[in-house]
Amino acid sequence: TPIARLLVTMGIAGGCTEFVMGGISLNLCMEYDLSFQKSVYDAQYLAFLSGWLNERGVKIAMESDNAAALGVITTPSISIVMGIIDLVIAAEQGAKYLALAYVPMHNFIQDIAGLRQQRRLTKKYLDMLGYSDVTLYQDIHQWNGAFPEDRQKANGLIASVSAIAALYGEAEQMMVKTADEGMGVPTMESNAEGLILTRQVMNIFRGQRYPNSLEVLEESKIIELEVNCMMKNILEMGDGDVLIGMVRALKAGTYEFPYAVSKHVLGRVTLMRDNTGAVRFLHTGNVPFPPEVIEYNREKVELRKKIEGREEMMMLADDLREVRAPLIFP
């Protein structure tokens, strides 16, 4: 929830050492008409509380829910930028232990590149803005979209994310899901099964790392271009203040969180998977990307259209409804 002062205060009093925050991200994902002033004030209070406790020897970590709450597809760049903004807001208030969420989209190449760039680029901007003294963590979430009701399909989803996490090898945390996720509140037994499955996959891939292939390097390059473009625009619009810049960018549509429920999102940016399952920009709206970024995304989407021979809207509907819909040729 974007308004969590009482909840977090009670949690800390009960022994909780980390909590999720997001003055911008949780507002966009979970509220239709909540003012940024209210949600950011709440996040700033929690960050100040975290910093105050840190100074007194109680280590409290804050995690940006930079993509996890959305529950649909997103590009690594959109998620990374949102995480940077959330963590800068927290660092400004004195929080020292900061975590970033990452929800794999189930394309190994894009996800490995995204995870690596998320840590590197977030550190870059925190350092640049004067917050080099923070400790940064990563938390991989096992898919926050619609879970299959079929338990075997759900287990396959959990296993695939676990494999991505294992081959990335640098995340400090993972939010484990269960095969009952698509049916309702999981039982204690179902939670235990999810943990066993995750640990088994992690053990199988123990000691292995996904190599820096040409494909990973290419994906890393495009992610960095997209992130730097959006961050440059946000900093310019805020005259160096990331919070003011983000609010102005959202109003102008030069940054968007596609498919979010908030009325503060213009809704001109749309995303779709390409033929490999990687998430691309279908429409870039008002985001000031350079021509090479727009063309790269366009080519990837057009190739899928050519191969599948289906209407764009039907493919998009599949992408939003399932993790990866079965391919049925017309």
Tell me the role of every PLM-derived stretch.
Residues 1-93, 97-101, 107, 293-330:
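Catalytic alpha/beta active-site cores
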Residues 12-15, 19, 47-57, 123-126, ...:
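Structural signal for hydrophobic packing residues in well-ordered secondary-structure cores
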Residues 37, 58-193:
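Long alpha-helical, hydrophobic tracts
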